[in-house]
């Protein structure tokens, strides 16, 4: 009789370990994933959701990106370098001042009034319309995406417009 009780206790303990250890591991892994996702979302200069939502008509999403030129054309990346923004052919690069006045800039989902009061603090380069160019990218079989790019100076702006012509 004592042997039977001992066996049952041993079996019960092993069964619990077999079930709860993997569950605990999965829970910890999920917790790390959620924390990493939140940190990345909050601290990343460009949230993926905003990149994919940038095809809204009449709106240009302002992205702090860097541009490099090579034999393959222009490559746009966010300032951290995590997200490759280029997903199609670059159609045009124009100074913001040359665009129609109805175009509205957005920064992280909020409207940005160039040269006017804004609803939230935005980087200075966003409100300096003289140094912003707009890159239009056309994806195969999809709508054109537009990105507002900050240029550090007039020479860079002119160079970008030359590449886009």
Where are these regions (language model features)?
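Short structural boundary motif marking the start of a folded domain
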Residues: 3-5, 65, 131-133
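Conserved beta-hairpin
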Residues: 54-94
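Short, solvent-exposed secondary-structure boundary motifs
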Residues: 50-60, 115-117, 125
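Non-transmembrane, membrane-adjacent beta-strand/coil modules in membrane-associated proteins
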Residues: 12-15, 77-148
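Hydrophobic alpha-helical transmembrane segments
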Residues: 37-51
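Transmembrane helix-loop junctions and nearby membrane-interface residues
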Residues: 33, 37-40, 59-63
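Short, surface-exposed linear segments at secondary-structure transitions and domain or protein termini
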Residues: 15-19, 93-99, 153-164
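N-terminal membrane-targeting/pre-transmembrane regions
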Residues: 1-38, 124-125, 139-146, 152-154
């Amino acid at each position: 009789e004592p042997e039977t009780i001992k066996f049952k206790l041993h079996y019960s303990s092993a069964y619990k370990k077999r079930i709860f250890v993997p569950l605990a591991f999965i829970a910890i892994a999920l917790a790390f994933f959620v924390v990493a996702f939140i940190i990345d979302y909050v601290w990343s200069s460009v949230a993926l959701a905003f990149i994919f939502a940038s095809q809204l008509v009449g709106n240009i999403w302002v992205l702090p990106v860097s541009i490099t030129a090579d034999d393959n054309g222009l490559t746009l990346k966010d300032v951290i370098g995590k997200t490759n923004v280029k997903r199609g052919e670059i159609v045009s690069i124009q100074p913001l001042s040359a665009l129609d006045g109805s175009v509205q800039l957005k920064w992280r989902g909020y409207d940005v009034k160039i040269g006017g009061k804004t609803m939230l603090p935005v980087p200075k380069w966003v409100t300096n319309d003289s140094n912003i160019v707009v890159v239009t990218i056309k994806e195969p079989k999809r709508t054109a995406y537009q990105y507002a790019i900050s240029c550090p100076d007039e020479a860079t702006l002119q160079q970008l417009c030359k590449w886009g012509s």
